[in-house]
A protein has these predicted regions:
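Short terminal alpha-helical segments
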Residues: 1-26
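Amphipathic alpha-helical interaction modules
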Residues: 18-53
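Alpha-helical solenoid scaffolds that mediate protein-protein interactions
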Residues: 77-78
């Protein structure tokens, strides 16, 4: 289960990183858009594999695309388990 949350955290971090990459967006918008698309698809796949007993707040954050909040939630969960 922790492996799932580690993958989700990585995917969320990647998408947030791409969003924050203003240089890439300005210099190569096509690549920027492709990286956004790829990161979003990865998150969508992970959302579909979300455990049935997932915390309702995490589900809410992911459904609303509250990426920062979802990442904070997942990181807190992993930290609490010593990862």
């Amino acid at each position: 289960m922790d492996e799932y949350y580690a993958q989700l955290a990585e995917a969320l971090q990647e998408r947030l990183s791409v969003i924050a990459d203003h240089t890439l967006r300005t210099e190569n918008p096509v690549v920027h858009l492709e990286r956004l698309r790829s990161a979003s698809e990865r998150i969508e796949k992970l959302k579909m594999a979300l455990p049935r007993n997932a915390d309702p707040m995490l589900v809410h954050y992911l459904e609303r695309s509250s990426l920062n909040k979802a990442l904070e939630f997942v990181e807190h969960r992993l930290d609490a388990r010593g990862h």
